[in-house]
From Swiss-Prot:
Subcellular localization, as worded in the UniProt entry: Cytoplasm
Enzyme Commission designation: 2.1.1.207
Sequence intervals crossing the membrane: none
Keyword terms, alphabetized: Cytoplasm, Methyltransferase, S-adenosyl-L-methionine, Transferase, tRNA processing
CDD domains (alphabetical): SpoU-like_TrmL (cd18094)
Taxonomy, superkingdom: Bacteria
Keyword Translocase found: no
Reactions that this protein is recorded to catalyse: cytidine(34) in tRNA + S-adenosyl-L-methionine = 2'-O-methylcytidine(34) in tRNA + S-adenosyl-L-homocysteine + H(+); 5-carboxymethylaminomethyluridine(34) in tRNA(Leu) + S-adenosyl-L-methionine = 5-carboxymethylaminomethyl-2'-O-methyluridine(34) in tRNA(Leu) + S-adenosyl-L-homocysteine + H(+)
Major location category of this protein: cytoplasm
Protein name, entry field: Putative tRNA (cytidine(34)-2'-O)-methyltransferase
One GO BP annotation of this record: wobble position ribose methylation
Function per UniProt: Could methylate the ribose at the nucleotide 34 wobble position in tRNA.
Amino acid sequence: MALHVVLFQPEIPANTGNIARTCAATNTALHLIRPLGFSTDDKMLRRAGLDYWEFVNIHYYDSLDHFFQQNQNGDFYYITKFGKRYYTSYDFSDPSKEIFFIFGRETTGLPKELLAENEDRCLRIPMTENVRALNLSNTAAILVYEALRQQSFHGLS
């Protein structure tokens, strides 16, 4: 497993369900950091993921610290509108690397101290100034498919 999507305290079940479907389609692991803003039995979550849940490699953590303790050998990238560099300026081309794309809450993003400690790994997707943020599930798909594009869609048909 080379690609990972990490959701820090996601709040909207449909976003997480859509991301789970993208993860199933791309053999990308999904990591959820509690607390979640919904039950994993939520109808909207299940509906968005359709019948692909059995194909999702999903992991749960009680905190960011717990997540980092369990995943020490990865390349971590923090997705934020405050990143100084575009996502396209990073090299994700090595399919043997464990690449983690870390996303924050839909309403508040990632903790500011985490971003400050990892400024060189904060990346963003360009957009006009009149839009506050892209949808979380769309953003995750953009990052996953950019990494896969750089890897010549390794393992996909």
